[in-house]
Design a protein with these regions (language model features):
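Bacterial N-terminal signal peptides that target proteins for export
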Residues: 1-9
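Metal-centered catalytic cores of metalloenzymes
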Residues: 15-77, 81-144
Length: 144
């Protein structure tokens, strides 16, 4: 009987340890890409969207980016920060070619980059030959 009680106690302790272990959060973000949001604004008819998730345990940001109607092929695409809407900022996460839509990728963020993302201080933009400073841009915002 003593062994049975010890076994039950051990199983109970193991169960509590498992349910008490903190789980990573999956945080979701999105951005709408337009020429009007670029800095300085462009008259581009291009548009796009960014859908991203951030794993707080692995610190990995994963994204899917769609865009269309740019003035030419994308020559560069990046996440920038820290910057509020309408302000420029350095590149934080560059995307590697090919840059054809849709773009799928991931990167491990530093703690500072994760804070920029969480605080709405990160944006994504796409550059073309006609708009070397950026053709379309969107500020990353928390999403459900």
């Amino acid at each position: 009987m003593k062994a049975f009680v010890s076994g039950v106690a051990l199983c109970g302790a193991a169960y509590l340890a498992v349910i008490a272990t903190p789980k990573a959060d999956q945080l979701h973000y999105a951005a709408t890409l337009t020429g009007a949001a670029e800095t300085p604004p462009t008259d581009s008819k291009g548009s796009g969207s960014v859908i991203a998730s951030y794993d707080t345990d692995t610190k990995k940001l994963q994204w899917t980016i769609y865009y269309s109607d740019l003035t030419g092929p994308a020559i560069a695409a990046h996440f920038h920060g820290p910057a509020p809407v309408g302000k420029p900022a350095p590149i934080e996460v560059p995307l590697e070619p090919p840059l054809d839509s849709p773009l799928f990728g991931s990167a491990t963020l530093t703690d500072a980059q994760a804070k920029d993302l969480a605080d709405g201080m990160m944006y994504f933009n796409i550059h073309t030959a006609e708009h070397k400073q950026g053709e379309i841009r969107g500020q990353m915002q928390g999403a459900m």
